[in-house]
A protein has these predicted regions:
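Alpha-helix termini
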Residues: 19, 128-131, 141, 145
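Short, surface-exposed loop or secondary-structure junction motifs
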Residues: 1-110
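Short acidic/glycine-enriched loop/turn segments that link adjacent beta-strands
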Residues: 18-19, 115-117
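Short, surface-exposed beta-strand/loop micro-motifs that present aromatic residues
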Residues: 110, 117-130
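Residues at secondary-structure transition points
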Residues: 51-52, 97, 118-124, 142
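Short, gly/Ser/Thr-rich active-site loops of penicillin-recognizing serine hydrolases
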Residues: 78, 97-100, 140-160
């Protein structure tokens, strides 16, 4: 996946010849980046990456040159409820902001990937806008969505 998309700054944790100087991954205030204990995140991919590469990956998913239409539909068909206003499917999550709070009813929905350490790559199809962030801490998974809502509220006020 990395080579065809020219994601030169992405690799699998612990399977890289020369580990780069990566940001810390914090769990209860302890930095786990140099410990061989991050196998807990293999369901999230165990990938070290940059926000630029996350954007490259999300754009590749959206432009239709990376997956078949059928697989893309399966990935974006988020039927299972994760939490209020948050749904998931085959590798993707969908955020219905009007369901999260009636005060967010005018905010367009987004979908994409979200990790346990507060990292996300999300796409607003209606506005053709990508939202990418990485908070690097297990304690920021929920906080990252709160911050996304704040960012979206500012972004939605900007006239382009």
């Amino acid at each position: 996946i990395f080579k065809p998309l020219d994601m030169d700054d992405s690799y699998l944790m612990f399977y890289h010849d020369e580990p780069d100087d990566i940001l810390g991954v914090y769990i209860d205030g302890v930095d786990y980046r140099d410990k061989n204990a991050l196998s807990m995140d293999w369901s999230g991919g165990g990938i070290v990456t940059t926000m630029d590469d996350l954007l490259t990956f999300m754009m590749a998913l959206e432009n239709g040159n990376f997956l078949s239409d059928e697989v893309y539909r399966q990935m974006t068909d988020s039927k299972e409820r994760y939490d209020k206003g948050i749904y998931y499917g085959m590798g993707m999550m969908y955020f219905d902001f009007s369901e999260i709070s009636s005060l967010l009813g005018s905010m367009t929905d987004v979908y994409g990937g979200m990790g346990a350490t507060g990292v996300y790559m999300l796409y607003d199809q209606e506005n053709d806008t990508y939202f990418i962030a990485n908070y690097g801490s297990l304690g920021f998974a929920e906080k990252s969505i709160e911050e996304l809502i704040k960012i979206r509220m500012i972004f939605d006020r900007i006239e382009i």
